[in-house]
């Protein structure tokens, strides 16, 4: 027999990553009752910490965090070099990249961004997955978002007026269900949502290794006869 939670939430979110947590905060600000179900029991993981957990934040993300007063709670970017910015100022300043192709400030037409508010924040920052999740989880809990860890969504059934979500032998009800559970999303697969896009051309792996004479490797992006490597920080290679 399945155990049923008698509460009916406005929204259930699958996944307590940065996207799920930020969405939960926004919904809570709109007075919605929110439940997050996260399959991992422990939010702390070596894969979320430096060096594996290093992440780049784009301009819209930085601005969203700034507007909610969360940007000042991030500390790691103050101690790491942003490899996607150069020392130049003004029109020649690098403000980002796309697959390694640099964006120079003087070549960016900001008038094309119809829905972007002008501001003084950086266009890119380096952060860490665990730091970002910690800041967002703290805010979500302050907004009375309920987070249950160690419960993965295993299925759901949609009705005219809501969704019944299954997690093992437990049932939860909500008016809406949102899948923020990654590339292998159970919500997407169960709901038969299309995952449009192109097939990958290569697979990347993360590993911690000892390299002889690491000082011989140049910083930044480097193209060689045998391929390309990126050294974003001393000892951080891709």
Would you name each region that the model predicts?
Residues 23-32, 64, 143:
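A short, Lys/Arg-enriched amphipathic alpha-helix followed by its capping loop at the start of a domain
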Residues 180-238:
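Conserved FAD-binding catalytic core of PHBH/FMO-like flavoproteins
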